[in-house]
């Protein structure tokens, strides 16, 4: 009997000691969590977003300002969008050209930051349609607009153990290439309403996805009209435009060009023009055009099938 009582006392003492040990461990864990911060999935963390802008603000047009849009994408869904003008005077004074664009507050997780900069007079006067940065488009027939634009994309992971905040840099690049077509024209063949008609061969990109850095929509064999042929020194500018380009790629452009007068006749013609385009590059292409004369017939041999109708 005494032996049983002794065993019971020892067992009870060990249980009490074990319980004290468990309580001590729980207290240590609690203190550690209090020091480190308990993870809260709904807690937001500050992210400072800078823009690497380089020569972004070397712009001759003082009537427009760079306007920035930043889109926050999570699981292929836009969860935030911010738009604002960038003060160029302050931006020029930034060292290393890292301009503080904005601060975000985001829960922990994985994101993509998409950014777009174009030039506007007011918030509601863009040349580009930018409601969705996965499909940026150009407006048609908008004269006098500054078509330069810049894009940036950055994968971003917010860690819950970084409560102080993170700093990230958006490196902007140009998603556009531009070209100018020039030619020699006879003064006697010109009038005030000369029009260039360009027929593109193949696909012409019309929408750009900032996330993938690629063109996502195209027109097949479109025809574009450019009014107001201008003289520059001893050459005439037939057409000048900019196009979306896949990031880091070189693309070829093929087209035919006709120049018409105010009477509706075709005065000059170049059936096939080819040149290469590269993002952030401007190409000037001089075009030799055949003079159709008063009769609107090309001087020289005509090839191809001709249908003759006799009444």
What are these regions (language model features)?
Residues 28-30:
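C-terminal motif of bacterial Sec signal peptides marking the signal peptidase cleavage site
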Residues 51-64, 182-191:
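Structural motif
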Residues 11-20:
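Bacterial N-terminal signal peptides that target proteins for export
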Residues 40-41, 169-176, 244-246:
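Conserved "repeat-terminator" motif of extracellular CCP/Sushi domains
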Residues 138-229:
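Acidic, serine/threonine- and glycine-rich low-complexity intrinsically disordered segments
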Residues 32-35:
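Bacterial signal peptide processing site
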Residues 68-126, 191-279, 307-311:
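Tryptophan-paired
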Residues 89-91, 121-167, 263-293:
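Structured interaction patches on ligand/partner-binding surfaces of diverse proteins
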């Amino acid at each position: 009997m005494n032996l049983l009582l002794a065993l019971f006392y020892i067992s009870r003492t060990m249980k009490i000691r074990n319980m004290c040990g468990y309580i001590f461990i729980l207290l240590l864990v609690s203190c550690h969590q209090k020091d480190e911060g308990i993870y809260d999935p709904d807690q937001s963390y500050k992210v400072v977003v800078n823009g690497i802008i380089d020569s972004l603000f070397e712009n001759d047009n003082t009537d427009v300002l760079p306007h920035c849009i930043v889109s926050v994408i999570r699981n292929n869904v836009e969860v935030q969008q911010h738009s604002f003008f960038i003060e160029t005077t302050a931006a020029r004074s930034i060292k290393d050209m890292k301009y503080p664009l904005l601060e975000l507050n985001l829960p922990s997780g994985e994101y993509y930051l998409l950014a777009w900069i174009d030039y506007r007079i007011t918030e509601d006067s863009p040349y580009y349609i930018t409601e969705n940065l996965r499909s940026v488009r150009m407006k048609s027939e908008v004269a006098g607009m500054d078509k330069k634009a810049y894009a940036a994309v950055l994968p971003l992971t917010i860690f819950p153990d970084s409560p102080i905040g993170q700093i990230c840099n958006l490196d902007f690049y140009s998603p556009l290439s531009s070209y100018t077509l020039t030619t020699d024209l006879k003064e006697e063949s010109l009038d005030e309403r000369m029009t260039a008609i360009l027929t593109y061969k193949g696909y012409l990109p019309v929408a750009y996805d900032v996330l993938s850095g690629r063109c996502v929509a195209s027109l097949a064999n479109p025809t574009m009209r450019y009014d107001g042929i201008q003289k520059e020194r001893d050459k005439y500018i037939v057409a000048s435009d900019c196009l979306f380009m896949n990031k880091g790629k070189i693309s070829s452009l093929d087209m035919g060009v006709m120049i018409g007068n105010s009477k509706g006749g075709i005065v000059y013609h170049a059936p096939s023009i080819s040149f290469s385009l590269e993002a952030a590059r401007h190409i000037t292409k001089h075009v030799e055009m055949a003079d159709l004369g008063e009769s609107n017939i090309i001087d020289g041999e005509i090839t191809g099938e001709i249908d003759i109708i006799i009444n």
